[in-house]
Curated annotation (Swiss-Prot):
Record lineage: Eukaryota, Amoebozoa, Evosea, Eumycetozoa, Dictyostelia
Provenance organism: Dictyostelium discoideum (Social amoeba)
SUPFAM superfamilies xref list: beta-lactamase/transpeptidase-like (SSF56601)
One CC-aspect GO term: extracellular region
Top-rank taxon: Eukaryota
The protein's name: Beta-lactamase-like protein 1
Assigned keywords, A-Z: Glycoprotein, Secreted, Signal
Length: 628
């Protein structure tokens, strides 16, 4: 009988290989699955880094000249600090006498705001206020309606009126956050009317109720500022309802306490008080929303994201910004002259692009994303009151950060993907994904790009909008990544050599003594060596390298795995981990879709005497195999 495991590996590998050989009649070079060095602190005075930063400086200046940009801000972060920054030009790009730019000048970050909106969504999900990102938004905000011709087609003729069947209520949170909702691109108002009485929520919803979705949900990516404005509104509504419910519960509790003292006289009064309190809460909230229809959203972002990250120079309201600190954007008129663009608040569109910030504040935001959601001590030092933030060390779970950085849809070019809401680009030269977000609004062009495996981040801002899919971050990454990888690999090699030298110098008797002190019962690698079979013909071979004493295994094929201890404390001597010996030799498939990093469980005989312990079998990939 053929070896089942071996056959499965071989057939799948050949099939994947065949698929990868030709694409669009062009032969592809099959590269190994990329691995990345672990980020550690680097001396920023390294000559290679200084040279890289000089090249980046030159690249930015050349690109500025090519695109008529006179004012530009650039920052690069690594691990938990800004490692390079430079500003070009003046606060007022049309006035050479205005102050020079700094990384503390306010700019409108435009659609980078969407990353904050998305983070709020994940926080509410983690805190249980949203049950699932795949919940329909109608469960939380039934007020929103839009027509869906695809729903009518799928349901047949529908109702007699033909109207009720086309009202779409199936859009989800995840679809809004990943531009998969099928909604139109823009809020149905002239952008100049954002934040005015000519673009209120009632006006927007009345207009949308007469419009249609453009596409089926999840059919393709269609960028939607409307979708994110709606998402922010719904999230704010969830917070508002949660706050009102908490206030009502508190009022009810107080009234119940009063009832205990005045059972007969106060029953009616308590009921009236409950109603009055509920109404007062609603009136107060409505008053705030009437002056700013995204108040609950903006207030939440301020207290639960900006303040905990010590982003104290970021705001949705430009009236909060010192006019002498605002970097001005400019545009080219039809006659070829330049003009400063007037600033404005974004009103209902605020969650899609209304935040003003600084390069220093956005650097703190990048550091947060690059460090698994852990708030840097540098970010937190001036923050004594995190208000409603429930966890001062993490705004979200580490697993949520990983989830938020994952793609939702891969574009057909194979190099571009969209997440919630990161715009991702695969750098073929360096075999690594850039997780980016671009912003364009009111003469500001911004770009944030993260390289999570290397803990590198870039934030660039231009005070002039020009036609480009990327604001220099891809070109800069071509300079940064090779240098950082080289230095990190070099440091890793030096560390491993030092550790090996220390191990060789360590006295063997001290090791044995330490093992005795810890009362550790070690098993010799020799007892695991052998061939393991089962009745179905599956094979698992364990062998040893005599020169190193290390254990290896295979499944009767060419994939060789290193066997290592599962637990360094040796509390589980029967459990081992298997890892591909040299993952750089393989494409990604066997690394992510095979036995790599699996745990295997050996069984021993019942004799507890050390001298007579023998291995009788192993459980691997769900199968039980017995030693022959």
């Amino acid at each position: 009988m053929k070896n089942i495991l071996s056959f499965s590996f071989s057939f799948s590998f050949l099939y994947i290989l065949f698929l990868l050989l030709f694409l669009n009649n062009n032969l592809l070079i099959i590269k190994s699955c990329p691995t990345y060095p672990n980020p550690i602190k680097l001396n920023q005075n390294e000559s290679l880094l200084i040279e890289a930063y000089n090249q980046i400086d030159e690249l930015i200046q050349n690109n500025m000249k090519l695109n008529n940009v006179t004012s530009f801000i650039a920052t690069i972060v690594y691990m938990d600090e800004i490692v390079w920054s430079k500003t070009y030009g003046n606060l007022n790009p049309l006035d050479d006498k205005s102050p020079p730019l700094t990384i503390d000048n306010n700019i409108k970050i435009a659609s980078l705001t969407k990353v904050f909106t998305s983070l709020m969504m994940y926080q509410l999900r983690d805190n249980g206020k949203i049950l699932s990102l795949d919940d329909k938004i109608s469960n939380y905000f039934p007020k929103f309606k839009i027509n869906d011709i695809y729903k009518l087609k799928s349901s047949g003729s529908g109702s007699k009126s033909g109207k009720s069947d086309i009202k779409d209520n199936s859009i989800t949170f995840r679809q809004l956050a990943s531009h998969q909702s099928g909604l139109p691109r823009e809020v149905p108002c002239d952008s100049i009317t954002y934040g005015t009485k000519n673009c209120t929520e009632n006006i927007i919803f009345e207009r949308l109720s007469k419009q249609f979705t453009l596409l089926k949900q999840y059919s393709e990516v269609h960028y939607s500022n409307l979708g994110f404005a709606l998402l922010g509104k719904i999230l704010g509504e969830i917070i508002s309802n949660s706050t009102n419910n908490n206030n009502n519960n508190n009022n009810n509790n107080n009234n119940n306490n009063n009832n205990n003292n005045n059972n007969n006289n106060n029953n009616n009064n308590n009921n009236n008080n409950n109603n009055n309190n509920n109404n007062n809460n609603k009136i107060k909230t409505n008053d705030l929303i009437s002056s700013n229809e995204q108040f609950q959203y903006e207030n939440y972002i301020l207290n639960n994201i900006l303040k905990p990250l010590n982003m104290m120079n970021s705001t949705f309201n430009y009236d909060d910004i010192d006019s002498n600190n605002l970097a001005l954007g400019y545009t080219i008129l039809k006659n070829g002259t330049f003009e400063i663009v007037q600033r404005q608040n974004s009103g209902w569109n605020s969650p899609a692009g209304g935040l003003y910030s600084t390069a220093r504040d956005i650097s703190k935001f990048m550091i947060f994303w690059l460090n698994n959601g852990i708030i840097s001590n540098n970010n937190n030092k001036n923050d004594n009151n995190n208000n409603n933030n429930e966890n001062n060390d993490n705004l979200v779970k580490e697993s949520t950060i990983n989830e938020a950085l994952l793609p939702v849809s891969l574009i057909s070019d194979g190099l571009t993907a969209y997440g919630t809401p990161f715009e991702m680009w695969y750098d073929q030269q360096n075999n690594i994904w850039l997780k980016s977000k671009a912003g364009i609004a009111n003469a500001y062009r911004t770009q944030m790009a993260l390289i999570p495996p290397l803990k590198l981040g870039m934030f660039f801002s231009s005070q002039f909008v020009f036609d480009t899919p990327d604001l220099f971050t891809r070109e800069v990454s071509q300079i940064l990544i090779p240098v950082y990888e080289y230095l990190l690999n070099k440091k890793q090699e030096e560390k491993e050599e030092k550790e090996e030298e220390e191990e060789n110098q360590q006295d063997e008797s001290q090791q044995q003594q330490q093992q005795q002190q810890n009362n550790i019962k070690l098993l010799s690698n020799d007892i695991f060596i052998g061939n393991y079979l089962n009745e179905f013909g599956s094979i698992f071979n364990v062998f040893i390298d005599d020169s190193t004493g290390l254990l290896y295994c295979n499944f009767g094929n060419d994939f060789v795995y290193l066997i290592s201890d599962f637990d360094d404390s040796y509390n589980f001597p029967h459990i081992k981990r298997i890892s591909l010996l040299d993952p750089k030799k393989y494409i990604c498939w066997p690394i992510v879709d095979g036995a790599n990093e699996e745990l295997i469980y050996f069984t021993f005989n019942d004799d507890d005497s050390r001298n007579s312990i023998t291995c009788t079998g192993v459980q691997v990939l769900g199968q039980f195999l017995y030693k022959t």
